Every structure is written in structure tokens, then in C-alpha cells.
């Protein structure tokens, strides 16, 4: 499989290493500016590389990605950028009429499993308060994480009229049943931790996922790419790939 990388930060550097270990080829990298230390061919546009690649894997940011998605091309896409999620999904759905597109805010299959466990738990715990917490390294710039937003969306689909609460320090009233607390922690080198707390009367239940290495996200993207290149045009997630 010949892979075009969109972005060459810490995540796509891992993708490159792990993909080559699996026998795949990195044909080039799209970066905002050419970097002499990047060991691959530099491209400015997807259109420049689409005839050389079987798939593009993106771990970048909206500033780099969105202009590229406006180009005229047909190449399977694995997208892991977080930020501006609604705008991104709308654009990817549009592109999916002409190419297979895979998107996940978190490329870990374990996180996908967590969402399925959450879907099963919510109907059983209707009277429990829910609090969501995520923790990441001190270099992560967006908050809450795309994964936590995904977990909140699962809850929103199954509980009617819920309200996200991001900060309680100015509130001087009791917690209401429709609230879902959302908390972000940034520090050190934490790879990624996500907790869903169900708090009931005299008991609590916690669903938790802790990433121990960023390799799980890189491997998840590579596995998605391996499957995606054999799919027909369409919009794919872990639910249907």
C-alpha cells in the first residue's frame, strides 16, 4: 500500500514508522512548509500526489486540511484531524460521493468499544448523573478532546434534553438531572485518558479507557487504510468498516 501523509507531526511520524514495518510505502508528505529534515518527498497538494498513492492518512489540523479538501481529487482518505468537527464531517460526506472516506476522532478500536459499552449502559442507568473527564499531554491545544465530544454525542442521542456544563465555579445552585459535566485535564506526557462516571445513590460506576502509547492510534489509522482502499465510495467509521 502506498501512503500519502497529510501532516508530519508526532502521530504521522509514528504512522510512517509502523507502516513501513508492515511493508507499506510512504510516497510523500504534505506539510505547511517544506522541512529539510522530513525524509520523504514534499507535496503541496493532494492533486500532485494522487496518482502515486493508494490512500492518504491525515493527522494534521483544520488549517492544513480544509484547503486540501477543496481540491479536485479522487483518493481514499483516512482522516484523524480533530477540531471543527461538524464542518469537517459535512465536507467529508460531500467528498464521499466520489471516494471512500474514513473518519474517527479517535483511531483506537478500544475507544470505539468504549462507545458501544456506553450505548449499552445508558438505558440501564437512566437515574444516574453523568460526568465526562479527559486527560492529555500539555501540548494538546484543543479541549475538550474530539473523543470526549464523541462520548457526549453518544449520551445526547440516548438521553433527551441534556445540557453540557464545562465549568461550575460560577454556579451557586444544585446540579440538575439534565446536566452532563465535561472536564479537561492537560499535563505532562499523558497519552490520552477518558472516563465516563455514572453517579447514583450510594454507588458509582466508571467506564474508562487509558491509552498507553500513541502507537494504538497510528496502527488504527493504518488498519483503517488497509480496509478502506478496497471499499466503494462512501463515508466510513468504525461502525461500518
Swiss-Prot record:
GO biological process terms held by the UniProt record = diaminopimelate biosynthetic process; lysine biosynthetic process via diaminopimelate
Which residues are catalytic? 136 (proton donor/acceptor), 140 (proton donor)
Q: In which compartments does the protein localize?
A: Cytoplasm
Q: Report the domain of life of the source organism.
A: Bacteria
State where NAD(+) binds: 80-82, 104-107
A GO cellular component term found in this entry reads: cytosol
List residues binding (S)-2,3,4,5-tetrahydrodipicolinate.
137, 146-147
> For this protein, what is the EC number?
1.17.1.8
Instruction: Report which reactions are catalysed by this protein.
Output: (S)-2,3,4,5-tetrahydrodipicolinate + NAD(+) + H2O = (2S,4S)-4-hydroxy-2,3,4,5-tetrahydrodipicolinate + NADH + H(+); (S)-2,3,4,5-tetrahydrodipicolinate + NADP(+) + H2O = (2S,4S)-4-hydroxy-2,3,4,5-tetrahydrodipicolinate + NADPH + H(+)
Q: In which pathway does it act?
A: Amino-acid biosynthesis; L-lysine biosynthesis via DAP pathway; (S)-tetrahydrodipicolinate from L-aspartate: step 4/4
Q: Does the keyword Cytoplasm apply?
A: yes
Q: Which family does it belong to?
A: Belongs to the DapB family.
Q: HAMAP family, per this entry?
A: DapB
Q: What is this protein called?
A: 4-hydroxy-tetrahydrodipicolinate reductase
Amino acid at each position: 500500500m502506498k501512503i500519502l501523509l497529510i501532516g508530519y507531526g508526532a502521530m504521522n511520524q509514528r504512522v510512517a514508522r509502523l507502516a513501513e514495518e508492515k511493508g507499506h510505502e510512504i510516497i510523500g508528505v504534505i506539510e505547511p512548509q517544506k522541512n529539510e529534515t522530513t525524509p520523504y518527498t514534499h507535496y503541496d497538494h493532494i492533486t500532485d500526489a494522487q496518482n502515486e498513492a493508494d490512500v492518504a492518512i491525515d493527522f494534521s489540523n483544520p488549517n492544513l486540511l480544509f484547503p486540501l479538501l477543496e481540491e479536485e481529487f479522487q483518493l481514499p482518505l483516512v482522516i484523524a484531524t480533530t477540531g471543527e468537527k461538524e464542518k469537517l464531517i459535512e465536507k467529508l460526506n460531500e467528498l464521499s460521493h466520489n471516494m471512500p472516506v474514513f473518519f474517527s476522532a479517535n483511531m483506537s478500536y478500544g475507544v470505539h468499544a468504549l462507545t458501544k459499552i456506553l450505548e449499552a449502559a445508558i438505558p440501564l442507568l437512566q437515574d444516574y448523573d453523568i460526568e465526562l473527564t479527559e486527560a492529555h499531554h500539555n501540548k494538546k491545544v484543543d479541549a475538550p478532546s474530539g473523543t470526549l465530544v464523541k462520548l457526549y454525542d453518544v449520551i445526547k442521542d440516548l438521553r433527551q434534553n441534556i445540557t453540557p456544563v464545562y465549568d461550575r465555579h460560577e454556579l451557586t445552585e444544585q446540579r440538575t438531572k439534565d446536566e452532563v459535566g465535561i472536564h479537561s485535564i492537560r499535563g505532562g506526557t499523558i497519552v490520552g485518558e477518558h472516563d465516563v462516571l455514572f453517579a447514583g445513590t450510594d454507588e458509582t460506576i466508571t467506564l474508562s479507557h487509558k491509552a498507553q502509547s500513541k502507537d494504538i492510534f497510528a496502527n488504527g489509522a493504518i488498519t483503517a487504510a488497509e480496509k478502506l482502499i478496497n471499499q466503494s465510495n462512501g463515508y466510513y467509521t468504525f461502525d461500518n468498516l
